[in-house]
Design a protein with these regions (language model features):
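Bacterial N-terminal signal peptides that target proteins for export
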Residues: 1-10
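A cross-taxon signal for low-complexity, glycine/charged-rich
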Residues: 7, 23-24
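Extracellular, repeat-based ectodomains that mediate carbohydrate processing or recognition
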Residues: 25-454
């Protein structure tokens, strides 16, 4: 493989081979990006948006959790820095993060997601946004964040990446097509090993879908999505599909074939008609239970993302669970913003835990707030507050992420930020029991201890 340092020729929608290898730049601490989009959301956006997943993966062979985020440079420039960090579960130490890409944008929509293959190579998928291109990177060594190969430079907004047991890579992404009224369309493509991609062979899954969440369980892909009609803010309805051939064909939850591309709002994959209920939904997470059945976490709202403040109430965190025959819908708690995002996990004992900024913070009715850990012991029917992780904070916390295949020492991580004006953004993580730690903003050593937060 030829290795050199230099510019990369853009390869839009072409089959790509390894093109460049470089030594990524060692960072000097954990600092999140601050970002705003007028009228909808603002604040600490290091782990935004929810439609890029996964952002963190626990690797049992290395006993480390690797996680990506959008960072800010030490000199305070607002250029988004694509960063990767690691947590050593044996030593309880954080690695000094690595700068993989200094992006020519401050748009947090370009934040990355990641995956780890069966050989331990770390793949990073840097999202595209408008004229800003996406990229795919692979670590030069297994379970190592010091150097990466650049594989692809292409257009892939909202990437979601999963690696099957046979080594094939599935990538879901979005395209914008203003020519036929379907502004946002969902596509997927597959690579044999993640190093070569042919985006011309992508499968078009849905028109007007856009916002989706995916997960892979024992060879079966699940996808949940809403209807985001022609770019309007009225995202509604809840749909679920599954695939046993890594996205070539799809079926409904009960196994009936789905014609592609799906056209909304009428499709057999609809599991709840929120359009008739005049409600809006904001997808947060999709996981599977011990039987492989899907569970969805989402916000149910009375108004779209521009309907912030009390006029958007009531807003509820909701779960939708499939038991193999039918769907069950249950509320967890109320929230005060459509983008009060979080994640859901189920442990080996069947305990459900949802974590996110569900309490109002110092800036109510804006993105995020105070982080709370919620628990259910009856498959999501009833919930209790297990622990309030943050309180009396200076800034709102937002966009809590939980690693795929998590280990209890590193359960959730996120950033904070002032939602009313540009500010610094610190990064935090917690363990399964809700013990809270802050990641140091300044680091001069390869590995450091996290800072306990009382």
């Amino acid at each position: 493989m030829k290795r050199f340092t230099g510019a990369i020729t853009a390869m839009l929608f072409l089959s790509c081979l390894l093109t460049t290898a470089f030594s990524a730049q060692t960072g000097d601490g954990y600092r999140g990006i601050w970002y705003e989009i007028g009228g909808a959301y603002s604040g600490g956006m290091a782990t935004y948006p929810q439609h890029q997943m996964p952002m963190a993966v626990y690797a049992p062979a290395a006993q480390k959790t690797f996680f990506v985020y959008g960072g800010e440079s030490a000199d305070g420039r607002k250029n988004l820095q694509m960063m990767i960090g690691a947590f050593d579960h044996q030593k309880k130490l954080l690695a000094n993060p690595t700068l993989v890409r200094d992006c020519a944008t401050n748009d947090a929509h370009a934040n990355p997601c990641m995956a780890i293959d069966t050989k331990g190579h770390i793949f990073i998928y840097c999202a595209a946004r408008h004229k800003f291109s996406g990229r795919i990177y692979r670590s030069c060594k297994p379970y190592d964040i010091s150097a990466f190969d650049q594989l692809v430079d292409t257009y892939m907004p909202y990437p979601q990446a999963w690696i099957a047991d046979d080594g094939r890579h599935f990538l879901k992404y979005t395209r914008y097509n203003k020519g036929n009224g379907s502004v946002r369309e969902i596509y997927s493509t597959v690579s044999q090993d993640g190093t070569a991609w042919d985006f011309k062979k992508s499968t078009k899954i849905a028109n007007d879908g856009h916002y989706a969440a995916t997960t892979l369980h024992k060879g079966r892909l699940w996808m949940t999505l809403n209807w985001h009609k022609s770019g309007s803010d009225k995202r509604t309805n809840l749909y679920v599909i599954r695939s046993d051939d890594l996205g070539t064909s799809w079926q409904t939850t009960d196994g009936k074939p789905v014609s592609l591309p799906m056209n909304f709002p009428e499709t057999p994959s609809l599991i709840r008609d929120y359009l008739t209920e005049k409600k809006f939904i904001y997808l947060n997470d999709l996981i599977t239970d011990a039987k492989g059945n899907p569970v969805i976490l989402y916000v149910e709202a009375s108004g779209g993302s521009k309907s912030q403040g009390p006029k958007g109430d009531p807003r509820r965190w909701m779960t939708a669970r499939y038991d193999g025959k039918q769907w069950h819908f249950h509320p967890i708690c109320t929230v005060d913003h459509n983008y009060d995002y979080g994640n859901l996990r189920i442990d080996t004992k069947g305990i459900w835990r949802a974590i996110g900024a569900t309490d109002a913070g110092p800036h109510p009715y804006t993105t995020g707030g105070e982080v709370v850990l919620w628990e259910s012991r009856d498959t999501g029917v009833t919930w209790k507050r297990a622990k309030a992780l943050t309180k009396n904070s200076r800034r709102n916390h937002s966009y809590v992420r939980v690693p795929t295949n998590f280990a209890p020492e590193f359960f959730g991580y996120w950033g904070d930020g002032d939602t009313t004006q540009c500010s610094e953004s610190d990064l935090y993580f917690c363990d399964w029991n809700g013990n809270l730690f802050r990641m140091p903003r300044k680091i001069a050593k390869p590995w450091v201890q996290p800072i306990p937060v009382p």
